[in-house]
Amino acid sequence: MHHSFYGAMVLWVLGYADQAQHWGQDELARAQQGEPTPSLASTHLFAALLAQHRRDVVATRAAAEATIALATTHGFAHRVAQGHIMQGWALAMRGDAATGVAQMAQGWEAVQRTGLQLYRPYVLALLAEAYGQAGQPEAGLPCLAEAVTLVEATEERWWEAEVSRLQGVLLLQRSPADVDQAEACFQQALDVARRQQARALELRAALSLSWLWQQQGQRAEAHALLAPIYGWFTEGFDTADLQEAQALLEALRARDAGGPALPPLP
């Protein structure tokens, strides 16, 4: 039943955000026909995952709330917990980081009690990102270290590049003195994404690395890295990642011409 959502997430990773969105919307529309069924909670959860991939906070929260409501009605404890994780991430990204982190941590503990193994590196990466939003990189970095261990133990590598990128982000947030280690994390994320042909994650890694390089005065190198990666995309230009890439490229060009300062680290 959820094959379309798995396909949609693959399309997103490969760089086809609009096609992924259409697949996901079609699957959700089919699932919503007729009376609500227990499996509809799972469908809404997958919709939340896809929205989170797109960094669509509003859609993530709405789908997470639908997941929680349906899973509660049908007694799906693990889906309730997963819904709380996604809802917490959305809250953290919207500015209520303390509430979001607490909700995610509670949901993560509940998921662990179920013994569910799938998506654990992904969830830990979301939790680490939320800790970063809360200004607690020192709490987020152990989550990412655990995610790395799980990736190696389970070979669940689809979010590996993002785990490495977020390590770099949180290292810089913790201390500017960690710049060399952060740069290595961004480069590793870029290398992993390229090996996997994960264009969406390659773009994120390039964004972070390009931002760091321009901070170090390497604006030409930053532009040379990011421009061809951005230029590959043919859709998804309304997504946060592509909009940030466009803004960074424009700022790099403007900065070279004596324009305003560059945007903050993605």
Spans of model-derived segments:
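Helix-coil-helix junctions within alpha-helical repeat/solenoid scaffolds
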Residues: 4-266
